[in-house]
Amino acid sequence: EASYEGRPMGAASVKAEGGLVRLHLPLQETHLWELGCGRLYDLKLTYGEDKVQSYAGLRSVRLDGYRFLLNGKSVFQRTVLDQGFYPDGIYTAPSDQALENDIHLSMACGFNGARLHEKIFEERFLYHCDRLGYMVWGEFPNWGLDVTRPDAVYSVLPEWLEEVERDFNHPALIGWCPFNETWDRDHRKQDDNVLRAVYLATKSADPTRPC
């Protein structure tokens, strides 16, 4: 079942016997997720006596040459580089309110999103991004990764794909950045096959976003 601002929007059912289930849910009204306006549908899923509540946002993202399009409209990404650092908790936020405050502060300074830099952010942070209409790029903390070595892919790929699987349903997340500042090091050339393998795996796991 789907609803928007308390009003029923549609319902559907499908036979489920375990494993992956696909369901088509027609909606009576379309309310798109936009910058500064995180329009979200409330969802209720029922299986037997079990019930789960969640939410979803509708939007599209794609590249058109050098332009980034959100819902088919060109958007300039005025984003801040957010390292998720807190003086008292280092990379752990002291409270849920602190996560939300960071977004409000960024928006008050004129930014419309963030590159989540060198850290896998808390899911609650992404929830607030969804709710507030604040776009973000997901990134993997790859410091210390030696991309001149072919076996580097075995270090980064499993954990990176876990992040993609965990977060890909967030409408606020508009792109993936699996590497930060890759280049040759210590007079050794980076292995482009490492970057290519991670890129292709990312696009296979989530073909809906730029990477």
Language model segments and positions:
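Active-site cleft segment of glycoside hydrolase catalytic domains centered on the general acid/base Glu
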Residues: 146-153, 179-206
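Short amphipathic alpha-helical interaction patches enriched in hydrophobic/aromatic residues
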Residues: 29-31, 144, 184
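Secreted/periplasmic carbohydrate-active enzymes, especially glycoside hydrolases
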Residues: 1-118, 122-123, 128, 132-133, ...
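Short, acidic/turn-prone active-site loops that include or flank metal/cofactor-
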Residues: 140-146
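Hydrophobic residues in well-ordered beta-strands that form the structural core
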Residues: 136-138
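Active-site metal-binding loops of divalent metal-dependent hydrolases
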Residues: 119, 140, 180-182
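Active-site groove signature of glycoside hydrolases
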Residues: 160-189
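An active-site-proximal structural segment forming one wall of the substrate-binding cleft
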Residues: 153-170, 201, 205
